[in-house]
Curated annotation (Swiss-Prot):
PANTHER family documented for this protein: UNCHARACTERIZED PROTEIN YQGE (PTHR30327), UPF0301 PROTEIN YQGE (PTHR30327:SF1)
InterPro entries: AlgH-like
A single cellular component GO annotation: cytosol
Top-level lineage group: Bacteria
Species the sequence originates in: Ralstonia pickettii (strain 12J)
Family note: Belongs to the UPF0301 (AlgH) family.
Name of protein: UPF0301 protein Rpic_0619
Any single Pfam family the record assigns to this protein: DUF179
Length: 190
């Protein structure tokens, strides 16, 4: 019989940081899990906008953003790994060269062609751009979950793309029927 850890797959789930999260990097975050397997896990923080918008970022990478309503869209802190690199989470299209398909209809793309398409008015209809990602080695995430570091729930793309970033934490908890004020940082306490 397989161990319980062998059966867990958090791909297309939200990780919701518990109040007692020991790592301040992830305090108050919601992480969308793009990949989780026996080698480890990769996700993107979806509720931590940084002080840069798409127009500014596109200028830095020599792209002219033709769609003005997108110019003020926030760029997000995706996690502490490779923070100089962009990761685009978007509705699945199958059109870009370096994309990871995620069950549930989303893709994570790391190639510049998706940004070029967005700059020219094409590209995915719904997307968020993060700098960096959250990564865990084999067994690390499972250990954090067992120590009450994270709650998990099936992801809802509407929260990623249509809920304001400051409301995504509460919206993700609401998927579990939890009011954020009712959480305790200690296991076994309400």
């Amino acid at each position: 019989m397989a161990s319980p850890d062998a059966l867990i797959n958090l791909t297309n789930q939200f990780l919701i940081a518990m109040p007692g999260m020991a790592d301040s990097t992830f305090s108050g975050t919601v992480v969308y899990m793009c990949e989780h397997n026996e080698r480890g896990a990769l996700g993107l923080v979806i509720n931590r906008p940084i002080d840069i918008d798409l127009a500014t970022l596109f200028d830095k990478i020599d792209l002219k953003l033709e769609i003005h309503p997108l110019a003020e869209q926030s760029v997000y802190y995706g996690g502490p790994v490779q923070t100089e690199r962009g990761f685009v989470l978007h509705d699945a299209t199958g059109a870009y060269s370096s994309s990871l398909a995620v069950p549930g209809g989303l893709e994570m793309t790391t190639s510049k062609d998706v940004l070029e398409a967005v700059a020219q008015g094409g590209g995915p209809h719904r997307f968020i751009l993060t700098l960096g990602y959250a990564g865990w080695s084999a067994g690390q995430l499972e250990d954090e979950i067992s120590r009450n570091g994270w709650l998990t729930v099936q992801a809802d793309p509407e929260i990623i793309f249509n809920v304001p970033p400051e409301e995504r934490f509460a919206a993700a908890l609401n998927l579990l029927g939890i009011n954020p004020a009712m959480l305790s940082g200690e296991a076994g306490h309400a």
